[in-house]
Every structure is written in C-alpha cells, then in structure tokens.
Amino acid sequence: MKLSQFNFDLSKDRIAQEPPRWRDEARLMVLHKDSGELEHRQFKDIIDYFGKGDTFVLNDTKVFPARLYGKKEKTGADIMVLLLRELNREQRLWDVIVDPARKIRIGNKLYFGEDESLVAEVIDNTTSRGRTLRFLFDGSYEDFKEALFALGEPYVPEWVKEKVSPEDTENYQTIFAAKEGAVSAPAAGLHFSRELFNRMILKDIEKTFITVHMGIGHFRTVDVEDLSKHRMDSERLIISEEAAEKINKAKRGGKKVVAIGATVMRGLETYVTTTHEVNAFDGWTNKFIFPPYQYSVPDAIVSNFHLPQSTMLMSVAAFGGHKQVMAAYDEALKEGYRFGHYGDALLVL
C-alpha cells in the first residue's frame, strides 16, 4: 500500500494534551471488522466483549526519564539530549539524539544540571542527530543512574504537549510498568486501572505481559510512498516462556488473544511458529506491519487513535482492514474523539 492512503486532516486541538481524569474513562470506539459496525463506549466497558479464558497481552515496559537539558562546553549553548538506550553499563555509554546537533562533534563535552555536576563526552557520530556519549562519573553504577535520571524528564512527544508537567511522570506510565527501558509509553496500556483489572478477575479474563522497550521509531516520519521500502527502528523484545505458554494455551482452547497496543501486535507476530503459536524470545525486532497482512496470533486488538501516516495506524489497518479502519477514524473525527498518547482508544474485533 501507499503512504498517502493513510493520510487524513487532523488539527492540533484534537490531540489530547492531558489524560482523562480516570484512566479507564477514556472513550472507546468498537469496530466489528467483518460488518464494519461501530459502537461508542467507555474504555471500562471493554470487558463486556470478552469472557472466561480470553487473554489480554500487555506491554510491561517502564518509561525512564529520557530527556535531559544541558549546555555545550565553551559556548554554553543550550542543548537537549534524548537518551535512547544504554550501550555499555561499565563504560557509561549511551546512544542518544542531540538537538541542535550542528557543531556537536566528537570530543565535545556536554554539561547537565544547574551546577553542571554531570558531564558527558561525545565519542561517536551515529547519524545526523545521533551521538554516542560517555558519561564521566566516578561513583557506583547505581549512583550514576540515580544522578542521571534525577536530571531527566519523561519524553512526552512535542506534538502531544510542548512542556512536560510533574504530573506526566505518573500519567505517562502504565500502572503495570515493571521493566525499565522505554523512551515512550505504550499508549493503549495507559487506559488500564486497578479497578478494571479487578473486574477482569471477576469475569475470569486472563492477562499476561511481554516487554517491548519502545524507542522513538514509532514517531519517525515515514518518508517513502511505497511502504515496502520503509524500515522500522529495532526495539528490544522479551517474551518469557510463561507468557508464551499462556498465550498458546488460550489459542489452543479457542479463547481470544487480545493485543493491547501496536507494540504488542508487533511483538506477538515477530517469532511465530507455522502452527500460529508464539515462541519465547529475547532479542530485537524491527517488524513493520502494514496491509495486506494476515495476523497469526491476536483475535482482537486495542490501540489509541494515532496520527496521520503513522506506522501504528498502519498496523491497526492491517488487522481491521484499511477501509474499515479509515472509516472508523473518520467517525472519530466527526464524534470528537481525542487522538495521540493521552487520547481515546479503538477496539477492533
């Protein structure tokens, strides 16, 4: 398919800058993909569509405070550094993006904190904006991580809100976040509350977790019209033996497997057997799903309403059908649904 087939007009005021007061009270549109029927509900009603033995698969990655503000040595120019991933624990090496990156060269030192207590040296150029930094810190690894993260803030994309608030530290994290490593939060998971989990238990709806450490590749602009030529950034994926068995047990028993979010959709489809079962996995995935594509694992998916031409929209359209999903998005625009990470959700059955 073509990139232009996923375009639509979305004004900035339709992108939610704050979450709803209660996580599970976001709006929920339900798309029945075979008939094209649409329903308008609240997210807490999602359990009405599932029953005993159906299994929700969620991403338990934990967002770390990835955005730092600092200054360049000598000139004192302001810079923003976005931590992408740790490359070497012992040497304090990190893969980062620097903005503005112009004139940030190998050998330059960058200073962070009001007292410039944390210093990093640029040791490599990876892309036009990408750099490898070595943080110069004499204390223990635990002390280093504490100092580094104390200076950071959550990376809430600029198109969501221009300035991060203290509340985002909690709001931009799922209640089940467990394994630190994500720059970006799994948006669909943000809607789950403890009360909703308790109601799932009462209905004998199962849940399990996989880990996908989301970077910023989901936000990267697709710049090719032919989608087969687009390449996704790699993300760390971990599916435990226990999670794989729970998912496969549901499939064998004729129960529904529900993928919560685009990252889970990608993760479940990364390493699948010929009998449509999930294998345990610990590695990297750059799987890019777009129509036409036949999913092997999920029987239903949940996703937020995403921006035009985003890879996440494409993966949803691959499951629900391009025509039906784009019609649902058109309905969402007409009915005042909120888009983006803090926005409303779409359930596709």
Show where each model-derived region lies.
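Surface-exposed, charge/polar-rich loops and edge strands
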Residues: 1-349
